């Protein structure tokens, strides 16, 4: 079996695994984000209307608020959102280490700003909020160092490794004949594509598969592209049965595939705001339709009229006249039934349903997070007002850290290291594994939930010290300051290290000791001078002392 045939077999198995999720995803897209899916490669550049099931846009607006709020609160390009650290906290007090980490963070931020990562992350957050699953490729780029490619839901298939994290991804997408030849070379494309190229059909779309999976057959010690930790193979879906476009590899898994919530061994996400709100979203469309029908019946009711004027012209415009025969008592045009125009109950129900959708999407919390970035709203205000929802988002944020942000930073760091874009680390850090600390608005808010306990404790001890000052002896102020600074995201460069504090205190103690010695010397001199000026009369103590010595 050729490599391509083996990969097509794997792809078929992955398609079967994903099949049960597709109807739910399609329904979510129909009511929230109709143009966000790509279940068929033929959907490229399709501009037909797809929002025919949406009457009330509350779900779409709430989803946009969630995406923007996560962008502002987790990975805002306007403020620092991560910090590198060493596993040993004492090492962070060493100035060369601290300065090296600061330079690396600055260069990584420059790479992020130069790349398209901040254009791709909003789609990642939208997908994970709507479909509970998202995927994003982080690739090397000669000009921008890294380049990201977000995958629309429906265009990729994933599988878990032994640790239940995603380590396999097959992506199905389209490329034009011109793009294929420019990317892979004319000698690597199928005979069908070569024929299209020769005949000038450069814009014809071709279905391509990109597969990334663990390279179980790699030869350890070899450094070539085919023996990396992860295998990468591009091939045409059709075309020659045994030809691939490119066979290479990656040193790190390049696909970030975060899930909102996962059930057991499932590969795809099992729950998210979009799934939770779907029932309310569908109910809202029905309520809006019923409200419109009721208003329509009031403003344009069904009418009844005498059969004798069936073929006559009837005027229903204001001021119009319709002539009727007067025979009979009921010869008039009138509504078939009178509709009561009270729609207040419907409006109240619509408002309640909208609030349910907003609550499912955490809209009020994410609106506050955006205000922090745009209006300098203090993080403490969010903590005080939305502490409960911050705690509810805790597991989601931890999963985002491990499945998205950690992998993004590790992948970017490794690419920069291979391109020699990082400074030489101090000798003390050679071979050391760094850790990442997140200091975004959301991360600070999560950590600062515990800051209030520190503040309450300090207030309690301060009040107690007014009655019993020795209570202050129980406070470890140095440790408290370090913990507080870390919780609220203060840069370590503006907090003095333990060595610096010890040196400052030693210098202060020496100065105080010198001042005490000088003061004691001055007091001794003053005492001697006073003693020398004392008169030696017979009744003085000095005379008695002098006499006693004779």
Give the predicted meaning of each segment.
Residues 1-30, 37, 300-550:
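C-terminal anchoring/interaction modules
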Residues 1-203:
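Extended, helix-rich architectural segments
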């Amino acid at each position: 079996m050729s490599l391509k045939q083996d990969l097509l077999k794997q792809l078929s198995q992955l398609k079967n695994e994903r099949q049960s999720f597709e109807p739910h995803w399609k329904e979510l897209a129909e009511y929230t984000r109709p143009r966000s899916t790509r279940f068929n490669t033929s959907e490229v550049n399709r501009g037909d209307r797809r929002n025919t099931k949406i009457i009330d846009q509350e779900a779409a607006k709430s989803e946009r608020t969630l995406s923007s709020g996560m962008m502002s609160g987790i990975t805002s390009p306007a403020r620092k959102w991560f910090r590198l650290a060493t596993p040993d906290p004492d090492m962070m007090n060493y100035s060369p280490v601290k300065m090296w980490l600061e330079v690396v963070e600055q260069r990584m931020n420059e790479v992020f700003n130069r790349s398209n990562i901040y254009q791709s992350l909003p789609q990642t957050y939208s997908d994970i909020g709507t479909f509970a699953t998202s995927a994003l490729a982080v690739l090397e780029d000669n000009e921008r160092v890294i380049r990201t490619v977000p995958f629309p839901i429906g265009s990729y298939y994933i599988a878990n490794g032994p640790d239940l994290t995603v380590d396999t991804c097959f992506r199905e997408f389209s490329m034009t004949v011109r793009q294929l030849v420019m990317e892979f070379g004319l000698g690597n494309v199928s005979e069908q594509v070569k024929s299209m190229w020769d005949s000038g059909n450069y814009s014809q779309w071709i279905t391509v598969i990109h597969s990334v999976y663990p390279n179980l057959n790699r030869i350890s010690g070899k450094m070539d592209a085919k023996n990396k930790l992860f295998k990468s193979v591009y091939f045409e879906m059709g075309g020659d049965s045994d030809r691939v476009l490119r066979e290479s590899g990656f040193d790190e898994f390049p696909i970030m595939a975060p899930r909102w919530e996962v059930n057991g061994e499932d590969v795809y996400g099992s729950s998210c705001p979009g799934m939770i709100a779907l029932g309310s979203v569908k109910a809202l469309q029905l309520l809006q339709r019923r409200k419109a029908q009721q208003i329509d019946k009031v403003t344009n009711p069904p009418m009844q009229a005498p059969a004798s004027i069936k073929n006559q012209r009837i005027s229903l415009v204001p001021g119009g006249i319709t002539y009727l025969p007067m025979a009979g008592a009921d010869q008039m045009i009138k509504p078939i039934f009178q509709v009561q125009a009270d729609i207040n109950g419907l409006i109240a129900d619509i408002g309640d349903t909208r609030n349910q959708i907003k609550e499912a999407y955490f809209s009020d919390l994410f609106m506050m997070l955006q205000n922090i970035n745009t209006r300098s709203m203090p993080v403490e205000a969010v903590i005080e007002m939305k502490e409960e929802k911050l705690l509810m988002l805790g597991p989601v944020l931890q999963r985002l850290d491990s499945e998205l942000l950690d992998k993004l930073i590790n992948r970017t760091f490794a690419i920069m290291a291979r391109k020699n874009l990082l400074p030489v680390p101090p000798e003390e850090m050679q071979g050391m594994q760094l850790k990442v600390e997140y200091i975004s608005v959301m991360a600070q808010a999560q950590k600062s939930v515990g800051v209030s306990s520190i503040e309450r404790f300090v207030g309690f001890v301060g009040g107690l010290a007014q009655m019993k000052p020795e209570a202050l002896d129980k406070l470890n102020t140095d440790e408290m300051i370090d913990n507080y600074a870390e919780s609220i995201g203060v840069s370590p460069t503006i907090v003095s290290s333990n060595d610096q504090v010890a040196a400052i205190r030693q210098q202060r103690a020496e100065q105080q000791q010198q001042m005490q010695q000088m003061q004691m010397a001055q007091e001794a001199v003053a005492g001697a001078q006073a003693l020398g000026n004392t008169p030696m009369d017979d009744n003085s103590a000095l005379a008695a002392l002098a006499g006693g010595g004779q």
